[in-house]
Amino acid sequence: MKKAWILLLTALMALSFCACQSKTETPAAPAAPAAPAAPATEAAQTAEETPARKAQVVQTGSGITVMTAEDWAGKYPEIYKSYLANNDNKEVHDYTKDYPMIPIIYEGMAFSKFYGSARGHTYTVEDVTSTGRPHKLANCFTCKTPDYTAMVNEMGDAAYQMTFEDALAQINESISCYNCHANTGNELVVTHTYLADAMGDDLQNVDPATLACGQCHVEYYFAPQTKATTLPYQNLATMTPDAILDYYNRTIVDGQPFADYTNPRTGVRQIKVQHPEFETYMGAGSVHKDTFTCADCHMGEATAADGTTYISHTWISPLENKALMENTCSQCHTDLTGQVRAIQQETERRTYAVGYLLEGLTEKLALAVESGEYTEEELNGIRAVARDAQFYWDFVFVENSEGAHNSALDSDCLDKAEALANQAMGMFK
């Protein structure tokens, strides 16, 4: 049920903004913000503009002006048209209806009230402002708009402490060219510096066409003191679910491990995982991470009426890209669509099963707290195990590919979530 339309969302929400499918042709994703030069008027969307494959990081400082997608339309008309085609993805699903355990599992945070599916990059500002959930700080705009990305690059951590409304007044468009290209037009640039900070020297070990997507399709948290968007690792080796959980458990805030929220009935200090597509795809067990970038699968090469080739910026599932399926995927897969759907069905089955187990654990722990029959030490022991169980489940639930990006990692996370939930159940009197 969750995302019966997942094959589209896997592309629209999961992994996007990248470079080329054919690494020798046409423009792709981000680049460092230079002073905005007026874009050229001719549609120079040819191989001469192929970006270098070395990771670039945005130059921060004052005087940053964002060039909008429309500003680039004259130079890249076909790419611009393909970008606007993302507007067709209008449907929103409320996950709290599709997954009835969510209001219990997420109790204590806004997602328990409404959890809408993402509609893609052209709707990010509209979606974050119309959730019905209160937003205090501007950091909610991280990865929602190039305007806020530029604010952070110009102001530093001070931008994270702006109010939501003050930032909104300065926002003009949803995710667009600057997020992945800065103001360069066709080069790939890491414009979200927290990714570069977290990757360290490993930044150069990942293709820029994957880094472009990995800027936003990641697990992150807001640092308690600065409210800055922060990734919970230091390199590729510490980007695993186990290491990330350990990071959070070792990050002490007011004498207790970091938490995104606390369940009001159980007292469990919960971690709310975001959308760890980057960590999942780059993780152990990933079959394609060393061969294909995010863009290779989700941004196909297209041909304009005049014969010009360009990279489509309509983010789709690779299963919807007939040329990719026939010319590339078929070399190894005889029935990739059937294989992917089988993986997704099994992942969904287990996600529901473990989710209901966590719902039952939450209710049982709430009763234990209310009963007064347990010492605080006993309750804290159960809470610690329940916290870890939910983390592993959430890592899969919110990743958006239903196991397609890395079924081995997702299966391992669900195994751990199930084992920990059962362990916690066994701790009751």
Show which residues each predicted segment covers.
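Positively charged n-region of N-terminal signal peptides that target proteins for export
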Residues: 1-4
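Sec-dependent N-terminal signal peptides
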Residues: 6-13
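C-terminal motif of bacterial Sec signal peptides marking the signal peptidase cleavage site
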Residues: 16-19
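Primarily the internal scaffold of c-type cytochrome electron-transfer domains
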Residues: 24-118, 153-174, 179, 184-296, ...
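Long, composition-driven intrinsically disordered regions
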Residues: 103, 108-129, 136, 146
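Membrane-entry segments of alpha-helical transmembrane domains in multi-pass membrane proteins
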Residues: 123-136, 161-171
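Active-site-adjacent structural elements in enzyme catalytic domains
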Residues: 133-138, 145-148, 170-173, 182
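Glycine-rich active-site/cofactor-binding loop and its immediate structural neighborhood
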Residues: 143, 152
